[in-house]
Amino acid sequence: MNLEKLGRFAGLLEPMPCIGLAYIAAALEQHGCHVRAIDMFAERLDAEGVVDKVARFKPDLVGMTVLTPSAPVCSLLSQMIRVRCPEARIVWGGVHADVFASEIVASRDADYAVHQDGEVTVCELVDAIAAGESDLSGIDGLTWLADGIPETNPARAINQDLDGLPYPAWHLFPYHRYGLLPFADFAKPVLTMSGSRGCPYRCDYCSLIHTGGKVYRRRDPIKIVDEYEYLVDRFGVKQMGFIDPIYPLVKKDLEPFVNELISRGLDKKCQWLSETRADRLDTETCELMYAGGCRRVLMGIESGVDLLLGNVNKNITTAKVREGVANARAAGIQTVGLFMIGLPGETPEMTKETVEFAVDLDLDFAKFAITVPFPGSKLFEDRWQKDLFRDDWENYTTFNPDPDRLIYHPPGYDPAQLVKMQSWALRRFYMRPRQLRKQFVDLRTISPKMLLYGLYGMAI
């Protein structure tokens, strides 16, 4: 990602653990490969710095996780690596690579693109490269060049045995530099875990089906605790984040998970947070989560207008949101509301209604992101079919200070006004006396540095 494009919002970013790449690294190590991991953002490297590290390692295969805003940087890295390491092959994974696999290999940004779960696919690719094979048609879940023409092999069968995967190879990453919420981390080190893959919901703005898959799969709760304990003991983790879009989704898994955490004393050693839907937070669920050490939930609320929630197939109501937030607060869990402004059909008046809804909920934290139709989402597909999409990928960011670079705005909603509304939303929510007291007296989670960045981001 080009941080310069984020303008005044750049300082609000903090490196987060890349669990997908860590899973791939672990699978390759288990397969007998010598693996090196580089986190460009966490290590504060420019492109030349990354390529220098790659060249010193002399790799046979270079892999990158590619999100849409980082695609131009990854393309540049690929070009530079081909010059410095001409014998190395390049493989891309992630949402962007999944959606644009044929274009990526045709343009030579990468030699291969991996689709969805990549652990087995990459190991088979390594074996084929080592054996000097040119025909890769037998590797499911791979796009490659066959006689100069992009060829996408059949999809790989969904991996139902998530507990059979090795733990992510965090020892290869600068884990001590990671955060989860730059404005509100409890303690460090922090790492992430996955209790499931896939999602049964089909929100129009989400591209998850291109990484986690359409099929929802979950892990054994006891096995999850085993990994939790390993991360606490091995890396001294103080705050754990579940990267599942909804955790826990299956209520019957929560009680054994919590009981096992308590029996091992992990509820006292490490706090955890998860993202979920507000309508999954009944009283019993919240009380169990708190007992097990959960101290914060992130809820994808999106909007305070029921019409807009329906427009993006969220399948929830504002009444259910109120109920879930109240249950979490009653249990002692801090609440983070994730909102989107500029949804299809939205007007400035509706944006104000959403912000006032966030204020009325009395959330501990709130994030107001400008809607972006990310590749892989239905919002993007709709624009693709109407030939309205744009390929200036570096501008696919939810905090964009330049209205001329906004990827999307609802018809009739002036882009400049939408950008101003985002800054106003942050000021309206955070600059209230009650909220200021909460941050600095009750929660004490915002550092002076992040306060200054936040005020600058609000354009105060």
Describe the predicted segments one by one.
Residues 55, 105-106, 232-233, 290, ...:
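Non-catalytic positions within long, well-ordered alpha-helices that form the structural scaffold/packing
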Residues 101-106, 285, 345-360:
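Catalytic cores of alpha/beta
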Residues 20, 24-161, 370-376:
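Glycine-rich beta-alpha loop elements in corrinoid/cobalamin-binding modules
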Residues 1-13:
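Short glycine-rich His-centered loop
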Residues 16, 163, 168-338, 348, ...:
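Radical SAM [4Fe-4S] cluster-binding motif and immediate context
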